[in-house]
């Protein structure tokens, strides 16, 4: 769904990150989000005091990225003359907020992660990491949790450093009533939540 090297996002068919993924990211105090809370009807509240990785992953108020040069009037914004469109879109290209048909974002959450903010036509690329150190930590933590061996020592080496880097407090795992997969032990839930937040 991304054209990362082109400095644009959400440019292919129905796109958008799920609300479930957005709700997966914890508050900075380490507590899970209550998706039924009325305050989250305000788009800006969704991002307030949340895991820093959410802000890196999802476009929010104030996000910008450089666009490739506009050769034609954009199909999803047919207002104004071609010259007016070129002038309007020469520096910043917004996601397809008002697209229709196959070009609409079906969730309202646009991908930000991986966008090249310094894009120059034909003169850049965005690297894709093949395997991250964080993934190794998460594999270790999940194996320990699955085997019933997850404890403070494992947390100290795995989840705590990841949360600290994201600016989120570490809280001892407890069952989350809003976790999508109920019936899992709290430690497994916590590691899988962290994996989803870290690697999304």
Describe each model-derived feature in a short phrase:
Residues 1-19, 23-200:
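Acidic/polar-rich alpha-helix caps and helix-coil junctions
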